[in-house]
C-alpha cells in the first residue's frame, strides 16, 4: 500500500480486497495524538530558508520531502503540537494538509474565507501567510481544551475536538455494506 505524501494524491480502489488492504494500512499507519490547543502553534517556511535551517528553527521531525512538498505544492503551514507519550511531553512540527486547515480554524474558534483562501480572485486579495499564522496562533492560545490530531503520511490531516470519537473505518464500511444489502 502506498503512502500519500502530496495533498492532491488520489488512491483509486477497484475491489473489496483493495479497500480492505487500504483500511488495514490506514489502521496500522495513522496516528491520533491528543494535544492542548493553547500549546499549538502554526509556522511557515520562508522561501529563502533552507530546509535544514527550518527544521532546526521549528524543531521539525519529518522528512525533507514532506517539508518540500508542503512548501511547493501544499499549504506552507506547519503545526507545532504537544502530546504526552508514556508520561513524557513530546513536541512535533509537521506540515498541515489542506484538509486540516478548516479543522484547525475550528479549534481556534475562528473562520472565514480570508483565513483559508489561497488564490487571488477578482476583488479578493490573499492575506499573507505569516499574517494568517499570527492570527491563528493568537486565537489558539486562548483555548485550554484538548484536540485530537490525525497524523497521516508525515502530515497533519485533521485537528478535531477532544470529544471527537475516532471510529474504526472497517466497522463503518461493514455497517454501510450491511445497510445497502438490506
Which residues does each PLM region occupy?
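Feature for intrinsically disordered/low-complexity regulatory segments and propeptides
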Residues: 2-175
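Charged low-complexity "KEKE/polyampholyte" interaction tracts
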Residues: 178-182
Amino acid at each position: 500500500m502506498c503512502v500519500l505524501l502530496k495533498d492532491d494524491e488520489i488512491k483509486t480502489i477497484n475491489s473489496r480486497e483493495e479497500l480492505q488492504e487500504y483500511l488495514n494500512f490506514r489502521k496500522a499507519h495513522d496516528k491520533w495524538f491528543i494535544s492542548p490547543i493553547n500549546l499549538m502553534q502554526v509556522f511557515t517556511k520562508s522561501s529563502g530558508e533552507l530546509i535544514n535551517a527550518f527544521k532546526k528553527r521549528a524543531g521539525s521531525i519529518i522528512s525533507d520531502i514532506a517539508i518540500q512538498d508542503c512548501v511547493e505544492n501544499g499549504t506552507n503551514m506547519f503545526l507545532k503540537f504537544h502530546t504526552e507519550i508514556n508520561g513524557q511531553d513530546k513536541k512535533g512540527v509537521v506540515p498541515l494538509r489542506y484538509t486540516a486547515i478548516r479543522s484547525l480554524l475550528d479549534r481556534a474558534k475562528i473562520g472565514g474565507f480570508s483565513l483559508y483562501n489561497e488564490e487571488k480572485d477578482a476583488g479578493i486579495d490573499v492575506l499573507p501567510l505569516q499574517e494568517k499564522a499570527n492570527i491563528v496562533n493568537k486565537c489558539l492560545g486562548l483555548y485550554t481544551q484538548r484536540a485530537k490530531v490525525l497524523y497521516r503520511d508525515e502530515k497533519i490531516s485533521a485537528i478535531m475536538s477532544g470529544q471527537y470519537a475516532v471510529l474504526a473505518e472497517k466497522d463503518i464500511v461493514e455497517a454501510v455494506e450491511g445497510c445497502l444489502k438490506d
